[in-house]
């Protein structure tokens, strides 16, 4: 059990029988009354977010989680197979439990988050930024660097990303896996 004022980003709690991760928190001291803790919580299973307020000193059930590096080995329909980097155990994770799955290529290292008490897998987190090669996009025209116009491009994993006009096929780009946005071009 933890007190509500001890909640930080990344804290996992059990609330109404569901697991939530704290995405954001704020201590609020109104002009009158007691201080409250305003939080944004992400449902581990469904992925939705809720806003929740707690009184300071309110007891909450915390869940101890472990993050371990796993390597993506192969896919089998909607199920993805990962190998533990330390014990070489194989773990199967459903596609909808993997954040940033569209940008994952074979051999990618991801963090698998599991409940430490039951050893059940909660979800898998991709690195925030990945580097992928552009396999198809319309050719860029010289001088197309002045505007912020974007065009569609397909990367090596098959995902489609919006990129600036000057990006061409064969170039390596950096992508933010949380929202699928273009970050920059990688020069070799």
Swiss-Prot record:
Keywords: Cytoplasm, Elongation factor, Protein biosynthesis
Major site of localization recorded for this protein: cytoplasm
A single cellular component GO annotation: cytoplasm
Superkingdom: Bacteria
Biological or metabolic pathway of the protein: Protein biosynthesis; polypeptide chain elongation
SUPFAM superfamilies attached to this UniProt entry: Nucleic acid-binding proteins (SSF50249), Translation proteins SH3-like domain (SSF50104)
InterPro entries: Elong-fact-P_C (IPR015365), NA-bd_OB-fold (IPR012340), Rib_uL2_dom2 (IPR014722), Transl_elong_fac_P/YeiP (IPR020599), Transl_elong_KOW-like (IPR013185), Transl_elong_P/YeiP_cen (IPR001059), Transl_elong_P/YeiP_CS (IPR013852), Transl_elongation_fac_P (IPR011768)
One Gene Ontology molecular-function label: translation elongation factor activity
GO terms for biological process, alphabetical: peptide biosynthetic process
Record localization: Cytoplasm
PROSITE patterns noted in UniProt: EFP
General function of this protein: Involved in peptide bond synthesis. Stimulates efficient translation and peptide-bond synthesis on native or reconstituted 70S ribosomes in vitro. Probably functions indirectly by altering the affinity of the ribosome for aminoacyl-tRNA, thus increasing their reactivity as acceptors for peptidyl transferase.
Protein family per UniProt: Belongs to the elongation factor P family.
Entry protein name: Elongation factor P
Originating organism: Parabacteroides distasonis (strain ATCC 8503 / DSM 20701 / CIP 104284 / JCM 5825 / NCTC 11152)
Gene symbol of the encoding locus: efp
């Amino acid at each position: 059990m933890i007190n509500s004022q001890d909640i930080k980003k990344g804290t996992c709690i059990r609330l109404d029988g569901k697991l939530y991760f704290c995405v954001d928190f704020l201590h609020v001291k109104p002009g009158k009354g007691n201080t409250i803790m305003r939080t944004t919580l992400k449902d581990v299973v469904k992925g939705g977010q809720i806003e929740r307020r707690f009184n300071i000193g309110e007891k909450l059930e915390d869940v101890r989680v472990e993050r371990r590096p796993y390597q993506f080995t192969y896919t089998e329909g909607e199920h993805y197979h990962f190998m533990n980097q330390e014990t070489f155990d194989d773990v199967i994770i459903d596609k909808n439990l993997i954040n940033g799955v569209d940008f994952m290529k074979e051999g990618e290292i991801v963090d698998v988050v599991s409940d430490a008490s039951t050893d059940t897998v909660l979800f898998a987190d991709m690195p925030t930024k990945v580097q992928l090669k552009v396999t198809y996009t319309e050719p860029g025209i010289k001088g197309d660097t002045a505007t912020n116009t974007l065009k569609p491009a397909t990367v090596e994993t098959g995902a489609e990303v919006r990129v600036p006009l000057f990006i061409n096929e064969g170039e390596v780009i950096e992508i933010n896996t949380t929202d699928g946005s273009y970050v920059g071009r990688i020069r070799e």
